[in-house]
Amino acid sequence: MSEINISAAAVKELREKTGAGMMDCKKALIETSGNFEEAIDFLRKKGLAAAVKKFGRIASEGLTAIKINGLTSVVIEVNSETDFVARNEQFQNLVKDIVNLAIIAQNIDALKISKMQSGKSVEEEIIENIATIGENLTLRRMDILEISNGAIGSYVHNEVVPHLGKISVLVGLESNAKDKAKLAALAKQIAVHVAGNNPQSIDTLSLDQALVERERKVFFEKSKEEGKPDHIIEKMVEGRIRKFFSEVVLLQQNFLFEPKLTVAEVIKNAEQELGAEIKITKFIRYALGEGIEHEEKNFADEVASITKC
C-alpha cells in the first residue's frame, strides 16, 4: 500500500493536541488514513498520548544543570510540577542526559531534536517521561558560555546530585594568566558571589538603560515629594543611582568573600598578582522557576487533585 500524503499542518496540529513526537504523529495519521480522531486513539493505544492532559499544568519545580567541556559550558533548566519529582532518580538522569547533549547542540531548538541514546529526540524522550513519571515536564531554557582563553567558574546551589540543583551559575574569565589554578579559583568564587548576590549586569554600560531610567524617575519623584530644592534633588538622585549600581552591577557589588572590596577591586588585585589582564566576559545565573507563575493550592484542593488521578 502506498503511503498517503499527510500535510505538515496536520502533523503539527496532532502534535499540539497530543504532545506526541512529530514522527509518531505522522505515523499515526498514515495508519489511520488521515483521520484525526482515530490518530489520537492510535497514539493513546501506543501510550504516546498518555501525557496529553498533563501538558497544561504549571511546571515550576525541577532542576537546573551545568556542563563544562574545556572552554565551553552550558546551563539548562528542566521543569517538573513538584520538588518530589525533581528528587526522582529517573528525572535526574533525564536532566543529565539532556545537559550532556546541550553542550553540543548550542541552542535550544537544536537540542530538542538531538538524539538521545534511546534513538528518540530530546523532545520525544521528555514526552515519554511525562507519561511514566506522571507530571508535566518542560525543557524551559538553555544558554552557552564560551571563552577563548582563561577559566570558567561554576557553582550549583542546593545541589541534589553533582552539577544539578536549584540555582546554577557560570562565569567566564578571559585572561592570558599562566597560573590557571588561581584564575579558576577566582572564577569559582565569583560564581558563588553571583549565586548569592544576583547581579543584573557585569557593568553599568550593559545594564538595561530602561531599568536605570525607571529607577531614576522613582528616586526623583520620591525626592520631590520630600520638598527638596531642585539642585539638592539632582544630587540625591545621583547618590541613589550610585547605590542602585552597587546593588545590581556585578563589578560594583561588594565581593562576597571580601566585603570591604568591590568585585572590580578584587579583579584588579588578581591582575597584579597574576601579571595579566582579567576580564569577566559573561555570567549566567539560572534560578529554578524564576518568572514562572506558581500555582497556589490549599491542602484540600491538593488532596482532591490526587484522588482524581
UniProtKB/Swiss-Prot annotation:
The UniProt entry's GO CC annotations, sorted and at most eight, read:
cytoplasm
Q: Which residues form the signal peptide?
A: none
Q: Where is it localised?
A: Cytoplasm
Instruction: Return the Pfam families for the record.
Output: EF_TS (PF00889)
The highest taxon in the source lineage is Bacteria
Keyword Cell membrane belongs to the record: no
Identify the InterPro entries for this entry.
EF-Ts_dimer_sf (IPR036402), Transl_elong_EFTs/EF1B (IPR001816), Transl_elong_EFTs/EF1B_dimer (IPR014039), Transl_elong_Ts_CS (IPR018101), UBA-like_sf (IPR009060)
One GO MF term, please? Answer: translation elongation factor activity
**Entry coiled-coil feature ranges:** none
In this chain, the stretch annotated as Involved in Mg(2+) ion dislocation from EF-Tu covers 82-85
Q: Which UniProt keywords apply?
A: Cytoplasm, Elongation factor, Protein biosynthesis
Q: Which CDD domains match?
A: UBA_EF-Ts
Q: What does this protein do?
A: Associates with the EF-Tu.GDP complex and induces the exchange of GDP to GTP. It remains bound to the aminoacyl-tRNA.EF-Tu.GTP complex up to the GTP hydrolysis stage on the ribosome.
Q: Which family does the entry's similarity section mention?
A: Belongs to the EF-Ts family.
Classification via HAMAP family:
EF_Ts
What is this protein's record name?
Elongation factor Ts
